[in-house]
């Protein structure tokens, strides 16, 4: 927050909810706190930007007792491996994250901020397992899967024509894409581009998993 004077960091000690493990509060409680902050903004007409960073799908994969009805599942080790999971704990932690996101949107749909908000869901990195059926061996050997992350942009009123974009892209494209959706005038000095402008298909990527680090442009 040093470079952005109006940025406010909300840390674990600022949230009146219990710590569940080394990562702090549960993702579910984190989403509930975010919803509470958004609902109680002093000036609802002033635009705002919020980042919610989840951590529950990391070891030790804690399932909190207070989980709004989440039920763990037990499946065979063979099925876990084929799907790319390394343990039943990791599988259920991913399911809990999905459950928590769903609960957040349930809360958001009941709020005044819902229809005027652009929700952007993305991962910071992926993972690879050569035994997973949906992952090619090249994903594992070239570490490509580490850079294959989900990106979902959702807004009930602002995005009128939903679409699936199949062009190569990277996390550096998020800032100009979000600015474009918000119709904010800007000079793009980043290495990313607006994904909704189809005349630029080049994506800048960095592969730090290789030695030495490799840089490239993908069309």
Regions found by a protein language model. Give the residues of each.
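Solvent-exposed soluble domains appended to multi-pass membrane proteins
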Residues: 1-219
């Amino acid at each position: 927050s040093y470079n952005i004077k109006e940025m406010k960091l909300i840390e674990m000690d600022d949230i009146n909810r219990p710590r569940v493990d080394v990562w702090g509060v549960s993702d579910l409680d984190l989403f509930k706190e975010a919803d509470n902050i958004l609902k109680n903004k002093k000036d609802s007409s002033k635009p705002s930007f919020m980042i919610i960073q989840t951590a529950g799908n990391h070891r030790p994969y804690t399932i909190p007792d207070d989980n709004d009805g989440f039920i763990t599942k037990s499946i065979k080790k063979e099925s876990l491996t084929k799907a790319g999971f390394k343990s039943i704990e990791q599988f259920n932690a991913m399911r809990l994250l999905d459950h928590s996101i769903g609960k957040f949107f349930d809360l958001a749909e009941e709020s005044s901020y819902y229809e005027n908000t652009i929700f952007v869901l993305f991962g910071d990195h992926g993972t690879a397992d050569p035994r997973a059926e949906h992952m090619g061996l090249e994903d594992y050997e070239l570490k490509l899967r580490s850079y294959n992350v989900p990106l979902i942009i959702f807004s009930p009123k602002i995005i009128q024509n939903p679409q699936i974009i199949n062009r190569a892209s990277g996390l550096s494209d998020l800032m100009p894409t979000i600015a474009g959706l918000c119709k904010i005038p800007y000079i793009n000095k980043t290495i990313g581009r607006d994904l909704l402008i189809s005349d630029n298909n080049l994506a800048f990527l960095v592969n730090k998993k290789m030695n030495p680090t490799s840089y490239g442009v993908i069309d």
